[in-house]
From Swiss-Prot:
It comes from Streptococcus pyogenes serotype M28 (strain MGAS6180). Belongs to the ABC transporter superfamily. Energy-coupling factor EcfA family. Keywords: ATP-binding, Cell membrane, Membrane, Nucleotide-binding, Translocase, Transport. This is Energy-coupling factor transporter ATP-binding protein EcfA2. It is an enzyme of class 7 (translocase). The keyword Nucleotide-binding applies. SUPFAM superfamilies: P-loop containing nucleoside triphosphate hydrolases. PROSITE patterns: ABC_TRANSPORTER_1 (PS00211), ABC_TRANSPORTER_2 (PS50893), CBIO (PS51246). The gene is ecfA2. Its main location: membrane. Forms a stable energy-coupling factor (ECF) transporter complex composed of 2 membrane-embedded substrate-binding proteins (S component), 2 ATP-binding proteins (A component) and 2 transmembrane proteins (T component).
Length: 280
């Protein structure tokens, strides 16, 4: 499922004394089966774009096209509902949205809300809970009895149970320790390898380098760079000027260059750095 934004602008609280422009004439494509990352400083417009992709916001001007279905300023909620089924949105700290009395019921709620039978919804819930690493002995537990990391996995399973074709992740590993973050990113990697389109908002440049295949860089509501991670992270000075930084190995390689060691193309992953050091 591909997504396209054409001349999209968005204004919060339009027509009030508090109105503020969040996006300016955004044009972008998210290709079917891609792993696209959005990076930018706080207030750059990343989260607004995520909510446009899912239909939580409609554009003030322009068109958001999801699998050739257009969302405009005049779109009605019933027209957008099918898009929300196909584009799953995982907010920061999604565990805050858990509410059912058991883990299984919570994950099954979403598909039932879209008209799936209780039996099929339970089967989907069991499948997706297993996918995110929640063992069956936890299915009848109250979600709030679980650890923070487990609660987050349950919340993500609830999104996956609705069988989206696109998974939009807004800082999905926020607050997790390195082990928990790596485990969660590995789950998303496997989903991508299975054919799901992944959209990631993150401030962790190492995750962008290791997982994404395309990157958009936002600043003050505008796209200032776009391209493959390898290309984007060559722009060290610009990214640092925008307070974004680069992957750790890229920063190390740049220091070597600054000391006179020739490196034709800065590495962005540990594997690339090893190759650079090996071949000189």
């Amino acid at each position: 499922m591909s997504i396209n934004l054409q001349n999209v602008s968005y204004t919060y609280q339009a027509g009030t004394p508090f109105e503020g422009r969040a996006l300016f004439n955004i044009n972008l494509d998210i290709l079917d089966g891609s792993y696209t990352a959005f990076i930018g400083h706080t207030g750059s417009g990343k989260s607004t774009i995520m909510q446009l992709l899912n239909g939580l916001h409609v554009p003030t001007t322009g068109i958001v096209s999801v699998d050739k279905q257009d969302i405009t300023n005049h779109s009605k909620n019933k027209e957008i509902k099918s898009i929300r089924k196909h584009v799953g949105l995982v907010f920061q700290f999604p565990e805050s949205q858990l509410f059912e009395e058991t883990v299984l019921k919570d994950v099954a709620f979403g598909p039932q809300n879209f008209g799936v039978s209780p039996e099929e919804a339970e089967a989907l819930a069991r499948e997706k809970l297993a996918l995110v690493g929640i063992s069956e002995n936890l299915f009848e537990k109250n979600p709030f009895e679980l650890s923070g990391g487990q609660m987050r996995r349950v919340a993500i399973a609830g999104i996956l149970a609705m069988q989206p074709k696109v998974l939009v992740l807004d800082e999905p590993t926020a607050g997790l320790d390195p082990k928990g973050r790596k485990e969660l990113m590995t789950i998303f990697k496997k989903l991508h390898q299975s054919g799901m389109t992944i959209v990631l908002v993150t401030h962790l440049m190492d995750d962008v380098a290791n997982y994404a295949d395309f990157v958009y860089v936002l600043d003050k509501g505008k796209i200032i760079l776009s391209g493959k991670p390898k290309t984007i992270f060559q722009q060290v000075s610009l990214l640092e000027k925008k307070q974004l930084g680069v992957p750790k190995v890229t920063k190390l390689a740049q220091r070597l260059v600054d000391r006179g060691i020739p490196i034709s193309s800065l590495p962005i992953t540990l594997e690339e750095l090893k190759e650079v050091l090996k071949h000189g």
